[in-house]
Amino acid sequence: MSSIRFIACLYLISIFGNCHEDPYYQPFDKLNITLDIYTYEDLVPYTVDNDLPNPNDDTTSFVKIYFKNFWITVMTKWCAPFIDTVSVYTSHDNLNIQFYSRDEYDTQSEDKICTIDVKARCKHLTKREVTVQKEAYRYSLSSDLSCFDSIDLDIDLIETNSTDTTVLKSYELMLPKRAKSIHN
């Protein structure tokens, strides 16, 4: 049976250039990731550790933000655009963090599957970790929610050219999972 799959894959490669057409592919060249967190923990001070791509590993980048009692990690893998800018906004019990790409990057290649993994971890764990995912596990949000009331994650895949910027696709992930409201 595996030899039949191998021959079928070779046939698809000769026609399409790869073994399968990717139903989730978007030709984006910029990322915009927004994280809204509601928490009772201290939001200042914080430190940001931004690991831009390096010549030894151009497939993965991550940003880690440390607060007193929790930390947030955003990791991208096989994404053409990298997170090169981070903006942090705080008020009372709300934390808004924007991770995005401002520099010019190549368009996402169809033969590379970009994944974005966002984790929010509390220093003192009192609950089990929960994970939500979208688009065949490409985009994920996970947290133990021990020190957070809720977490909302928005991911925008953006295409730019000399005259226009277009959001090709947006994804929303929430913890705890809850139903969206319906507006008439």
From Swiss-Prot:
Keyword Signal attributed: yes
UniProt-listed InterPro entries: Poxvirus_TNF-rcpt-II_C (IPR010806), Vaccinia_virus_B7/C8 (IPR009176)
Pfam families in UniProt: CrmD_SECRET
Organism, as annotated: Vaccinia virus (strain Copenhagen) (VACV)
Signal peptide positions (record): 1-21
Keywords noted in UniProt: Early protein, Signal
Protein family according to the UniProt entry: Belongs to the poxviridae C8 protein family.
Name under which the protein is recorded: Protein C8
Top-level division of the source organism's lineage: Viruses
